[in-house]
Amino acid sequence: ITFHVEAAEKPEEVIELIRATGKMVGISLKPSTSFNEIKPFMDKVDLVLVMSVEPGFGGQGYIENSTARISKIKKYLKDNCLERVQIQVDGGIKLHNAQEVISAGGNILVAGSEVFGSKNPNQVIKDFYTNAHSIQST
């Protein structure tokens, strides 16, 4: 279960409530929110969701500084022995920028408009799969 840090008055309590259900915990970071807002919770979550568009509207373009943000989060996780924390990226994910996002540290990509706006969603999913595996094996 992933929640937006901006929506929680006491993120620690939200994390504890989710953990009590036995579910994995994710914390979401909007483009306008500083990574410093979620740093105190990194050792308590399983996933960081990096929003690479402003939430609320599908089909938006990828915000370019998101790649640097993903790299910064990946470095922080590595430097703090928190590499178990997954980095999910949502917003503007396309076949042409997936390699950049994965190379920066994205483990899970959300590609709604690219897949479901396609005439052949199955082929787009296969292309993502092929591209992701070729990137990870290099």
Report each predicted region and the residues it spans.
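C-terminal helical cap(s) of enzyme catalytic domains, especially alpha/beta-barrels
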Residues: 102, 116-138
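Catalytic cores of alpha/beta
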Residues: 33-45, 91-109
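Short histidine/acidic/glycine/proline-rich micro-motifs that form metal-
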Residues: 56, 115-116
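Conserved, mostly hydrophobic/aromatic
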Residues: 48, 73, 90, 101, ...
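Conserved anion-binding
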Residues: 1-86
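A short hydrophobic/small-residue beta-strand
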Residues: 1, 25, 108-109, 115
